[in-house]
Amino acid sequence: KEIFIMYIGIFHMECLYIHGSDIRGFKGVAGGVIRWIKLANDTAVAVDQLGVRQGSCAVYLDVWHRDIPEFLNLRTNNGDDRMKAHDVFPAICFPNLFWRLAKENINSNWYLFCPHEVKEVMGFCLEDFYGEEWEEKYRLCIKEPRLDKRILTVKDLVKLILKSQVETGTPFIFNRDNANNANPNSHKGMIYSSNLCTEIMQNMKEILD
């Protein structure tokens, strides 16, 4: 998915290792999604149409991703500048479960996972599901003791989102369940994210050629 979306100025970062995860038996060596987003940031700045117009790109990450708190600080002016990407447009993909918990019990726990670890341990990718099927898979991950979890309350995460939006105008909000429930071509694939302005939604598939 990442390779396909890079060609149209959108980065869906879901399958990358979280910061500090293991790679091929080496402990804690993964740099996380922020390092790769910085590459997208520099690419957008470099592609300026002969100095006429700076390139732009949106970066989408799921709200259950372990790096989401750091992702929300991408464009803020405080903190480590090595972890910033001021020229990209962050966006978050939400399931309906998140907003339902925010409405019914905002102090509920929200569990963050490493997508690569989920795939290795559980044998599936959370981002490949939506709606009730996604909620079922998410709850299986919560119950799985072999998965490392980062736990925030829904309230704390909403506060981080609002703080970022007040300071930077981002992240954009993409409700993936709603998009896929309304998808007239759901028999042909799944919608993972959107475009720079969050108004175009198309089926996305891996490039197999």
Question: Which stretches of residues belong to each language-model region?
Answer:
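Active-site cavity-forming subdomains of large catalytic enzyme subunits
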Residues: 1-209
